[in-house]
Every structure is written in C-alpha cells, then in structure tokens.
C-alpha cells in the first residue's frame, strides 16, 4: 500500500498513487487529520483481552425511575441471589423490597437521605422550611429526554432550585454502595472492601451512549469503580437482564396470562381475571423471602423451546418501556438479540402525568403550578396518595377509588381562588370525579382507567409495530416484566392484543426480575453472544475524488491532488448483528510523527445508507481521542501508524489502540458526553 499521511496542523496529503479508496487523510469539519489505512471488520477471539479480575461478590443496582434497589450473589454461590434488606417505611399496598428513587439535600446542598427516609423527613418538615430543602424524585428520565446531555446538565428540585445531575446520580449510587457494603460486611462478619465487588448498574436498552457514559461517570464519582479499573463496573441493559433471568424460570415461578394451558393450578376454565388475581397473590407472597435460588441449568420453561426459538421481553417500568427480541441457542442457553432494542417514554409516569392534567382541568393549571412551587412537600404527599390508589386500578373494579387531598391543598386553593375545592369540582365538567365529605377525591373506576389509557395504548401500538417485523413474527413467548407489569390493566391489554400470537408470561416477582437478572449478568457477562447495533457509526474521511461519482461541492484540491471531503467511513450499520468480541479495526497516521494527540470525530445516524457526514440525519455524536505520549520509542520514526480497535458487541462501545511501530498500547478515550 502506498505511503499515507494524515494529520493535524498544516500537513497536507502527499500521496500520489493510492491503492485503496481509504488511502486518504481524513480532514473534515475540523477533524484532526487521520488516515484509515486498513479497514477491517473481523471476529477474532484470539485478540488479547485484559486480564480478568476476580471478585468475591457481584452487586447489581437497579436504578429505576420510580424505585430502586440492589441484590447480590457471592461468586462461590452463584445460584443464590440475595435481595437487599427490607427498607424502613413504605406505603400500604406497595412492596418495599425496593425503595423510592427519591433524594433529599440539605439547604446547604449536602446529601441528607435517600428513599423512604428522604420522603418521610421531607414530609415532616414545616412548609416554610421545606422550601429551603432540595427534594428530587423520578429524575432518571432526564437522561433519556435530554438531547444534549453533558456533565453539566441540571436537575430541578421540588422547590424549583437547580442542582447538577451528575452530583445527584453520584449521591444515589454512593448511598447504595454504602448500604450494600454494610450489609455484606455484616453477613461476612468482617469489613468488605469495595475492591472485592463487581458492580452492575442497569439502564434502559433504548438509552443512547451519552446517557450510559453519564451513569458510568456518576459511578466513578461515587467510588464504585474508576477509569483505571473500569472493568469493575458493568452497565447492564434492563430488558437483557430480565431476559437472562426469565430463561431460568421454573413453572412455579411464573404466571401465564392465557386460558390455553394449566399453569400452577390455574385451569383453562378460569377467567383471565382469575389469572390476574393469582398473579397479584404470587407477587404478595413472594415479598416475604429475600434469598432466591436460581437454576444453574436452564429453567423448565426452555424444555419446550428448540434451537432458534424466539421470545420478546417487554420491560415496562416507571419511565420507559423497553422491548428486546432474543433467540435461544442451545444447549448452553446463550442468547442472541434479533432486533435492535426499541421502546420509548411510556412508563407508569405517564399515568401520573394524566392525573396532573386532570387536576389542572379541575382546579386550573395556574393553581397547580403555584401549589407545586409554594407547597412542594404537600404536592409530593398528594402524588404518594395517588400512587397507592393507582395500584388498585383493575379491569373489573366496580367501586370508586378515594384519593386524599392534603389539608394544605384545600386551604391554599381557598386562598388562591376565593372558593372551595368542592365548588371547583361542581363547576368543572369532569365527570366521574366527585368530592367526598371526608376530604377526598372520589374517582370512578372508569376515570382511573382513563388515566392509564394513553400510556397503555402507546405500549400496545409499539408492540404491534414490533410484531410486524419479519424477525419477530414467530415468537413463542412474551415476557412482561418491570414494575408497571404489575398493573392488571396493562396485563389485560397485552393479553387481549397478543394472546393469540404467543404465550404471555409474567414472572412471579415481576418487580425484581431485572434486579436478579442483572446479578446473573454480572456473574456471566458473556451470556448475550450477539447484539444489534442501534445506530450506524463511522468517521469522516477524505477519499480520492472520482468525477461523476462524487458531488462537485465536495471537491478539495490540495497540492495538485483532487480529494472528496466528508466521506462517511462506516464502522457498523444500524440493526447490524454484532457478536461479542467482534472487532472493528482502523489504522490512522498522525500528520506529524511528533504529534501527541489525535482527535477523531465520531458520527452516527439511524439510517444505514450513509455516504457523507453531511447527509440528513447524520450527527456528530462523540470523539475518539488517541493520546500518543509515551507510546513512541526514544527516536521518533518518520511515519507512525496507530491501530484502533473498537468493540460494538457489548452494552457500551469500547476502544483500544496500539502503536504499530513500537507495539505499545496507546491511551484511548471514547467520549460521547464532552465533545
């Protein structure tokens, strides 16, 4: 291959006879010049892998939008999964095997408490004092909804004050770290060191790279791991974790929502409603136990599966719904992703949003906005009261649901409007919501069910779209998991829409499925053998200009040579299958041999057929930074070649690099947040 140069500074192309379309400097849109020398996309399990560190225990943190928790397993007893100690506090009718994802900071912005403790303390504060404290809840969604997420992204507390999101996520993770290490130390009878622990943090599969990186940065700040010891922390995708756990289910650990088969004493003659009742009873009974045994072989459910059978996991949580399609590979039970993860912001928060809209309709948007600012703790109380009634909604419910209005709501409304809450309800045209003399909103079951409808409709529509895909048309099972999967209204909607296409199964401990699966993933991260790339990724390069093929506006003449600018050099395509361990290699040459840093812009697109980085839908999404200090020998060679190796088959994009001349490792930073 002819000699190639690329680079920063003023070094221009000096090539006269390129032998490859890639043999060109990449100098586009401010990129430091780079030359891809040897494009390759290979699977090579023999490549050196970093030495595996051994850990005594795996601790998984399920960091949820509405509730969070942790579970752990000692690596010597992988079949025993221990779910964290019971939380103090809790609401009637709500499982307290997890704790609310709520955090309280003092007026000085120092961490005070997390979970039920934070909520209860905030509730007991005097209203004038509460305004000074920073209370945050349901903040995880900010990472999904913020298009330009950075390390400086802010969150807004209940009192309207801003606080750095990274600080809040780090505080929350540090809290779980301390709780888990304390519990492990108590169990072991001696202090447990953080270095003994492999940490796993769950995130939605539909999250983009910046959000995953943000979670990792927060974990580093919380002291779970460090950039130097990044392998100590694994990011797990929530529906994948659920899938890993579901494949180990025994018959008594699940409820089938269909009238086709007898499952665990539920006969075909029973109504679907009886199945829901039984599901709730299973969930209730299961809360009594904290240690779960999992099969170290594949569960009984797979005895019906054959090589190549497919199933869908629908992870419906507080903020998002995540859909994953997996195919089983026997006999080991390894999993292959068949279609890139899809989903959207269709979690149970949508029901809360509809309730808030209803309150705005009855009492006025201006009042609700002011009430949230002036009485933040009372607003939290009102939403807690709604949460417990929301969980009582069911398709066959006939009696109304009562939601207690805090006294300060009634009092503040009278001051704000000059008339009573009761008067507002009478005057509003909202049917099905009445005022009771005990100071409660009485909602008819239809009114409550209507609050669920937009969110459930979105989930069903998304599933319908998924079932249209050829890869998904022959699925055998649909597993419904996540906290929102406990809602009988969602269960019935899924059963009605898809019960004739596949068998719909809910694990008994549906709210803990992801948590337990995340522990299993931490014990064996290689269980998912093939994933699908959610996006097309690549870099911008210069290619030799070809008359008639390249647009005239892309022509660049440098030192008498004609180049086409902004060419998209594709690493991987959207929805492409990528095996674990599959590597994408590129070689780059710095413009000047003495150059110490190469910065390469990474671009992404949802489309597959990308020709130029200026095509519609192509966005700059990150940078690859090659630090060449220390990688060279004593004498700087006339020409250096740096080979980068990228992995797209894991839950995060990873990169390594080596200086070909010296065979020394090059420090690589792949950054989707600070570019």
From Swiss-Prot:
<keyword id="KW-0539">Nucleus</keyword>
<comment type="function">
    <text>Adapter protein for SORL1, but not SORT1. Delays SORL1 internalization and affects SORL1 subcellular localization.</text>
</comment>
<dbReference type="InterPro" id="IPR043129">
    <property type="entry name" value="ATPase_NBD"/>
</dbReference>
<feature type="compositionally biased region" description="Polar residues">
    <location>
        <begin position="17"/>
        <end position="26"/>
    </location>
</feature>
<protein>
    <recommendedName>
        <fullName>Heat shock 70 kDa protein 12A</fullName>
    </recommendedName>
</protein>
<keyword id="KW-0547">Nucleotide-binding</keyword>
<dbReference type="GO" id="GO:0001889">
    <property type="term" value="P:liver development"/>
</dbReference>
<dbReference type="GO" id="GO:0005524">
    <property type="term" value="F:ATP binding"/>
</dbReference>
<keyword id="KW-0963">Cytoplasm</keyword>
<dbReference type="InterPro" id="IPR026685">
    <property type="entry name" value="HSPA12A_NBD"/>
</dbReference>
<dbReference type="GO" id="GO:0006954">
    <property type="term" value="P:inflammatory response"/>
</dbReference>
<feature type="modified residue" description="N-acetylalanine">
    <location>
        <position position="2"/>
    </location>
</feature>
<dbReference type="GO" id="GO:0051170">
    <property type="term" value="P:import into nucleus"/>
</dbReference>
<comment type="subunit">
    <text>Interacts with SORL1 (via cytosolic C-terminus); this interaction affects SORL1 internalization and subcellular localization.</text>
</comment>
<feature type="region of interest" description="Disordered">
    <location>
        <begin position="1"/>
        <end position="45"/>
    </location>
</feature>
<dbReference type="GO" id="GO:0042116">
    <property type="term" value="P:macrophage activation"/>
</dbReference>
<keyword id="KW-0007">Acetylation</keyword>
<dbReference type="GO" id="GO:0005634">
    <property type="term" value="C:nucleus"/>
</dbReference>
<dbReference type="GO" id="GO:0005737">
    <property type="term" value="C:cytoplasm"/>
</dbReference>
<comment type="similarity">
    <text>Belongs to the heat shock protein 70 family.</text>
</comment>
<keyword id="KW-0067">ATP-binding</keyword>
